């Protein structure tokens, strides 16, 4: 077994040796049993960059996780680096331009609450625990799609981290 040096990782780092690993590795679909090498809960873009660099330097695959809500478990895997952005869930509402900016970990329930307070609709899905970014990148079909269009129809801009 290879010993990895996790000291270059920032954010909250969970490895197989940590007490909370067993609970933190689980997906929404409890039938998915995957065992990632490390889970990095990112709070900043630098945390994400450091996790990507760690994975690249160690020839490890990565998965991005925001809500753990995927039927097939694509946000996790065996012996990989899980970059979890669920703690990056800030929402910025620009009423002048009628736009909303969300961080990668924002979930439907958080966005519905924020825009609902301002009287705005969001063409999100019916499950509150689904991540908004994953929902949108998957096309974004929801109960209000006939009225508001798909979630991806409302995407104005995306920022990627390399």
Give the role of each language-model region.
Residues 1-148:
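N-terminal accessory segments
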Residues 91, 150-162:
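Active-site and channel-lining beta-strand-loop segments
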């Amino acid at each position: 077994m290879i010993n990895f040096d996790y000291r270059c990782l920032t954010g909250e780092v969970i490895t197989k040796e940590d007490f909370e690993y067993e609970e933190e590795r689980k997906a929404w679909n409890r039938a998915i049993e995957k065992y990632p090498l490390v889970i990095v809960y990112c709070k900043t873009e630098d945390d994400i960059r450091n996790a990507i660099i760690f994975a690249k330097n160690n020839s490890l695959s990565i998965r991005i996780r925001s809500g753990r809500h995927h039927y097939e478990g694509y946000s996790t895997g065996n012996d990989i680096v899980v970059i979890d952005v669920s703690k990056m869930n800030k929402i910025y509402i620009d009423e002048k331009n009628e736009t909303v900016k969300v961080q990668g970990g924002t979930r439907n329930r958080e966005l519905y609450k924020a825009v609902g307070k301002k009287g705005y609709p969001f063409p999100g899905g019916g499950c509150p625990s689904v991540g908004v970014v994953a929902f949108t990148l998957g096309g974004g079909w929801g109960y209000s799609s006939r009225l508001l269009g798909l979630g991806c129809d409302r995407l104005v801009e995306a920022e990627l981290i390399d």
